[in-house]
Amino acid sequence: MERWWFDSILFKKGFEHRCGLSKSMGGLGPIENTSESEDPNRNDMKKNSHSWGSRDNSSYSNVDYLFGVKDIWNFISDETFLVVDRNGNSYSIYLDIEKHIFEIDSGHFFQSGLESSFYSYWNLSYLNNGSKTDDPHDDHYMDDTQYSWNNHINSYIDIYLESQIFIDTYIVSGSDNYSNSYISRSVCGESESKGSNISTSTNGSTIIESSNDLDITQKYRHLWVQCENCYGLNYKKILKSKMNLCEQCGYHLKMSSSDRIELSIDPDTWDAMDEDMVSLDPIEFHSEEEPYKDRIDSYQRKTGLTEAVQTGIGQLNGIPIALGVMDFQFMGGSMGSVVGEKITRLIEYATNQLLPLIIVCASGGARMQEGSLSLMQMAKISSALYDYQSNKKLFYVPILTSPTTGGVTASFGMLGDIIIAEPNAYIAFAGKRVIEQTLNKTVPEGSQAAEYLFQKGLFDLIVPRNLLKSVLSELFQLHAFFPLNKNSIEH
């Protein structure tokens, strides 16, 4: 027997939007106000469902908030559903279709009405192959037990889900294995579940899964950006103005290097460096799928960049700075010989001009297509930073974004005078899978997240994106780097 947990703390319209629900999916007529943007905490929300009565004379009842999924015969055989309603009441519902058992934990106010409704329905003549009508159509309908049961439960499912359950659905399995089924498909139907997700939890650990049907995401990706955390959709045109922060949960989504430069640098002050420097194929890397040079060309066309980092000088609230921004969209922000050379030249320029230095890190590590040439960039950049920091006593701030891993973490990512990380950033040297395969040990969930590493003292600050520019400005002035124009400090 498996146990299924439904968390109904979130509001109706999100689930309706995600699953495409605007009316009852299965049987007892439309649901009131499902297309309106209501306050989820309104008292009359409990009225928005039909009872188990007839279609023509429907009434409303608290009993009508049940549980369920589509294709009930395929999904439920011997299950216990754990439900929390929006008042915080929790209760369990046990259902065994084969043995005709339907139980609710004792003492809950839903029990009497819900059980009596269930057994009244179960004992109807057409479920027991009882009396037939003279109408051939009705006879066919009455004899179809699966269709009748499915339809009736589905109507309850629709009512409960639209009024109570959002996308944050937890499945607690009684077995040791994770459930591989997507509840969103059962809840929303095959055609309605695109973009929905579940969070599957067993023995204290949690994994988040999204629908594997990517057609709808691909079709509308020029309009919407899906949050990696809550799977909410964000309108692409306004996402940039919101600093790529998810409107639903505030999660820090990935940003391109150009957007980060625009966010950090004052208008009309950016002067790019070494834009014409491009990668070759120094070790003639062999690939059966795509030659290295062709892959570079492909990413250049896709991103509009020549390499995985942009470097240059500009002003931050009037303070002249040297800035390097890595772009994860270009080959995962991997560090090859060109990336290393551009960053080294930027550091040397900042050293000569006595400028504060910022490098925004977003990288999967050294670029394997360039072999040891990519690895030596770690030493080259670190050597340039040593002269910048130790000899010239200048100020360097790395900003670690998600993800920052591999050779970048092992070199200039962790050499700052003040190290700043973005919230929820994934920061590591080796990835979780590599560690587990190498050491044959399980890596705890969240142990490579910025918040956990901050508690261990790995860096100095976690700064939200909307506060980053002002925090950097304060740090620079604290270290005696002041605006060229004193009026700009007010901005």
From Swiss-Prot:
A zinc finger (C4-type) spans 227-249. It catalyses: N(6)-carboxybiotinyl-L-lysyl-[protein] + acetyl-CoA = N(6)-biotinyl-L-lysyl-[protein] + malonyl-CoA. Its main location: plastid. Component of the acetyl coenzyme A carboxylase (ACC) complex. Biotin carboxylase (BC) catalyzes the carboxylation of biotin on its carrier protein (BCCP) and then the CO(2) group is transferred by the transcarboxylase to acetyl-CoA to form malonyl-CoA. Zn(2+) binds at C227, C230, C246, C249. InterPro entries: AcCoA_carboxyl_beta, Acetyl_CoA_COase_Trfase_b_su, ClpP/crotonase-like_dom_sf, COA_CT_N. Residues 223-491 form the CoA carboxyltransferase N-terminal domain. Its EC number is 2.1.3.15. The keyword Transferase applies. Pathway: Lipid metabolism; malonyl-CoA biosynthesis; malonyl-CoA from acetyl-CoA: step 1/1. This is Acetyl-coenzyme A carboxylase carboxyl transferase subunit beta, chloroplastic. Binds 1 zinc ion per subunit. The gene is accD. One of its GO terms (biological process) is fatty acid biosynthetic process. It is found in: Plastid, Chloroplast stroma.
